[in-house]
Amino acid sequence: MNYNQPATLQAAILDWAGTVVDFGSFAPTQIFVEAFAEFGVQVSLEEARGPMGMGKWDHIRTLCDIPAIAERYRVAFGRLPTDDDVTAIYERFMPLQIEKIAEHSALIPGALQAIAELRGMGLKIGSCSGYPAVVMEKVVALAETNGYVADHVVATDEVPNGRPWPAQALANVIALGIDDVAACVKVDDTWPGILEGRRAGMWTVALTCSGNALGLTYEQYKGLPAAELERERTRIEQMFEGARPHYLVETIAELPAVVRDINARLARGEMPQGN
C-alpha cells in the first residue's frame, strides 16, 4: 500500500477560551489572580497571562517559578513554593473557576458562522483546552446553550501531558478517525497551543486579537485606534515567532479563508511539516 498525501483538510482542532468562547480569555486569568490572593500573594493580570495555554497546574507551577512571584511567596510563608503548595493553590483555583466560568462563556463574534462554514467544507471539529475535565464539562454545556457543539473534546487531564506536548491534538485525531495529521489544522490563541499543533505535525493558525495575547474585550478591541492595533499585532506576532504558526489572523472569523488556502496548498503537494 502506497502513501498518498491528503488532498484536503479533514479536521479543525479548536482551542476554547480566547478562540471560540471568552473573547480576551478572561475566565482563567482573573481566577489565577484571585486564587493566589487567597494565599496572600499578589499576582498581576499580566503575570497571570504569561503561561496561558498550559494545563492549569502547570500554569500555576510556572507562575511560582517566576522569581518575583516566588519572592512574594517567600515573604508570605518563609519559604519558596513547593509542588505541594502549587497543588494547594490549584485546589483553590478549581472551585473558583467552576463558580465563575459562566461569566465569560459568550461565543466569540463570528465563531458560529466560521465553524458552520468549515463543516460545509467537510471538516470535523475537534477541540482541546488547558482546562481539566471538571471545568470543561461546564464550558461545553454553556457553549451548547449558545449553539456550539464540537465533535470531540479533550481536557488537559485526559492525556499524560498537556500543552505544549501534542497529546491532546493527537487524541482528537484518533477519536475523529482522521487518517493523516497533515489533514488537520490546529487553531489557538496561545504559543503552547500552537506548539502543540506543530509537534503533532498539523497546520497551525495563531489568533492574535481574540485571546490571551491582546487581553481585551471585543468592544475594547474594536475601539482600538488603527495605529495602536497595528502595534499590538506586531508585538503579538513577534511573541508567536518561536512557535512558528503557519498563519496568523485576528479572530476565528477569518478561519474559513485560511482553510481554503491550506486546501490549495495541499492540492499542490505542500505539507505542514515542510513549512
UniProtKB/Swiss-Prot annotation:
Q: Where is the active site?
A: 15, 56
Question: What protein does this entry describe?
Answer: Phosphonoacetaldehyde hydrolase
Q: Which PANTHER family match?
A: PHOSPHOGLYCOLATE PHOSPHATASE, PHOSPHONOACETALDEHYDE HYDROLASE
HAMAP family for this protein:
PhnX
Binding residues for Mg(2+): 15, 17, 189
Q: In the record, what terms sit under GO molecular function?
A: magnesium ion binding; phosphoglycolate phosphatase activity; phosphonoacetaldehyde hydrolase activity
Q: What this chain does, per the record? A: Involved in phosphonate degradation.
The UniProt family comment states: Belongs to the HAD-like hydrolase superfamily. PhnX family.
Indicate the quaternary assembly.
Answer: Homodimer.
Record InterPro entries = HAD-like_hydrolase_sf (IPR050155), HAD-like_sf (IPR036412), HAD-SF_hydro_IA (IPR006439), HAD_sf (IPR023214), PGP-like_dom2 (IPR023198), Phosphonoacetald_hydro (IPR006323)
Show the Gene3D superfamilies listed in the entry: HAD superfamily/HAD-like, Putative phosphatase, domain 2
Which species does this protein come from? Pseudomonas paraeruginosa (strain DSM 24068 / PA7) (Pseudomonas aeruginosa (strain PA7))
Q: Which UniProt keywords apply?
A: Hydrolase, Magnesium, Metal-binding, Schiff base
Q: What class of enzyme is it?
A: hydrolase
Per the entry, the cofactor note is:
Binds 1 Mg(2+) ion per subunit.
UniProt-listed Enzyme Commission number(s): 3.11.1.1
An example GO BP is: organic phosphonate catabolic process
Q: Which GO terms describe its cellular component?
A: cytosol
